[in-house]
Every structure is written in structure tokens, then in C-alpha cells.
Amino acid sequence: MRTPSLSLALSVLSLLVLGSGHYAAGLELNGTSSGKGEPSSGDHSAGGLVVSEVSTISEMPSGSELSTGDYDYSEEYDNEPQISGYIVDDSVRVEQVIKPKENKTEGEKSSEKPKRKKKGGKGGKGRRNRKKKKNPCAAKFQNFCIHGECRYIENLEVVTCHCHQDYFGERCGEKTMKTQKKDDSDLSKIALAAIIVFVSAVSVAAIGIITAVLLRKRFFREYEEAEERRRLRQENGTAHAIA
């Protein structure tokens, strides 16, 4: 009695191991039945009929599960697109990744959405230029010029001061003394006027002297001529009287 019970237990155990192996192989190889093992013939003893009956009964649920599992996975793999790939190892298969195609409805919805304006457009550049071209006289150099107006030259990027009247310097902090200039100018004018008057007086005196000398010479000649005529007349009168 012990030998048939031991053989029955061994056969059931072997069937369970074979069924689990077949199920795992079916999951890995996508429903291909490779290496299915048939149950061993076992012992041709008197208890062989009982073993075969028990094996058929125990095989039914495992076989149905295997068939349903193979059918489900085969349908799933049939529905999937055929993607080219390469096998690194017997147990690992590397396949390429393909981006899923967008539906037409999604594309239409995306096209219907209003286009947003880019921030880096003309408006953005204008704002940047405005920020760059901000006048530093209004903020940083507000109190730079003491007695003048701050002016920013964009081409040279230099801040200068336009000084008020009578002020000069980098920050218009120095003032010119008008009183000293007036005194100097008055003195110079007085000196110039005096020189002009002196020169004019000298010139007038010289002209007067020259004219006086010329007139004297002229009158002296005329006087001498008149005197000579008078003498000649007197001499002629005396001569006629003697004769």
C-alpha cells in the first residue's frame, strides 16, 4: 500500500511543477508553446490506471488556466504594433520607443486656441531699451550740479553740468568775480582814453607848430620883399631929385 501512495504523491508533485513551468513559459514567450513536457509514463504497475486518472483530473484546471492565459496574452500582443527591436539576452528584449500620434480632435483643439504674444517681441525690446536709456540725472546724479542743470549725453554716456551765469567748474561750484573784472576794465578804458587824448593833443600841437612856422616864413618873405621895394623907390627918388 505504501508504494502506490508514494508514486501517486510523486506524480501529483511532478504534474504541479510541470504545470507551473508551462504557465511561466507561456507568459514569457507570448503564448508560444515551447518545451511542453508530457507527463511521464510512470510505472506500468497495477496502480498505473489510478495515477493516469488522477493526472488527467489534476491537469484539467492547470491546462484551462494555461489556455486562457495564452489566449489573453496572444490577443494583447496581436493588437500591439510591430516594433523593430533587438535582443540583448534570451530573457531581455529591448525595443524602440515611438511617440504616440496625436488625435485629430486634440490637434484641432490646439489650433483653435489663440496664439499668445511672445514676451521677447518688439514691446519687450522697447521696454528694455527704455530701461537702458533711463536718464541717470533723474536718480543717481540728481544733486550732482550745485549751480547748474544736469545733462546726460547718450552717445558718450557721460553726465555733464550746464552751469548758470557766472558759474563754472565740473559741478558748477566756482563763481567768477565780476567786481574785479569791472575795475580792471575801467582802468584799462581810462588809460586807453588818456593815451588817445595825449596822442591827439600832441598831434594837434605838432600840426599847429608846423603851420605857424610855415606862415611865419611866408609872411617874413613878403615883408622883406616889401622893404626892398620901398628902399628901391627911395633910392630912385633921391636920384631923380639930384639930377
From Swiss-Prot:
The propeptide sits at 25-96
Keyword list (alphabetical) reads: Cytokine, Disulfide bond, EGF-like domain, Glycoprotein, Growth factor, Membrane, Signal, Transmembrane, Transmembrane helix
- Please list the residues annotated as glycosylated: 30, 103, 236
Q: Which residues form the EGF-like domain?
A: 133-173
Q: Which cysteines are joined by disulfide bonds?
A: 137-150, 145-161, 163-172
| Region of interest (Disordered), residue spans | 55-75, 98-135
Instruction: Note the PROSITE patterns from the entry.
Output: EGF_1, EGF_3
- Keyword Zinc listed? The answer is no
- Composition-biased stretches, type Basic and acidic residues, lie in 98-113
Which cellular compartments is it found in? Membrane
Q: Which terms does the record give in the GO molecular function aspect?
A: cytokine activity; epidermal growth factor receptor binding; growth factor activity; receptor ligand activity; transmembrane receptor protein tyrosine kinase activator activity
A cellular component term, taken from the record's GO annotations: cell surface
What residue stretch is flagged as signal peptide?
1-24
Question: Which top-rank group of organisms is this from?
Answer: Eukaryota
Q: Compositional bias (Basic residues) spans? A: 114-135
| GO term, biological process aspect, one | response to peptide hormone
What is this entry's stated membrane topology?
Single-pass membrane protein
Protein's job: Ligand of the EGF receptor/EGFR. Autocrine growth factor as well as a mitogen for a broad range of target cells including astrocytes, Schwann cells and fibroblasts.
Xref: PANTHER family: AMPHIREGULIN, TRANSFORMING GROWTH FACTOR ALPHA
Write the protein's name: Amphiregulin
Q: Which organism is it from?
A: Rattus norvegicus (Rat)
Underlying gene: Areg
